[in-house]
Amino acid sequence: MKTASFILSFVVLLIVIITWIGEVSAVSEPEPVAKATAHAAAVHVPPICSHRECRK
């Protein structure tokens, strides 16, 4: 019974580590991609606001 609980806790820990590494790499990697998509969205999407400053 001890080995089963040890294996279960090890698997849970492994899943947590994998998801944490995935989140960290997702945060650190696509910065230029996010900037490019934000720029493309700012260029192509018409502004919702009707202020003159927002329309420029």
UniProtKB/Swiss-Prot annotation:
The record's account of how the chain is modified after translation: Probably contains 1 disulfide bond, which may be crucial for activity, since the linear peptide without disulfide bond is inactive.
GO cellular component, one term: extracellular region
Primary localization: secreted
Signal peptide: 1-26
Note: Not found in venom, suggesting that it is a minor component. Negative results: The synthetic peptide (tested without disulfide bond) does not show activity against fungi (B.cinerea and C.albicans) and bacteria (E.coli and S.aureus). Has no hemolytic activity against human erythrocytes. Does not show cytolytic activity against insect cell lines. Does not induce feeding disorder in lepidopteran larvae after peptide injection in the vicinity of the head and thorax.
Presence of keyword Chloroplast: no
UniProt superkingdom: Eukaryota
Organism: Eumenes pomiformis (Potter wasp)
Protein name: Venom peptide 5
Keyword terms: Disulfide bond, Secreted, Signal
Plastid among keywords: no
Tissue expression summary: Expressed by the venom gland.
UniProt feature coiled coil, ranges: none
Positions of the propeptide segment: 27-42
UniProt-annotated location(s): Secreted
Disulphide linkage map: C49-C54
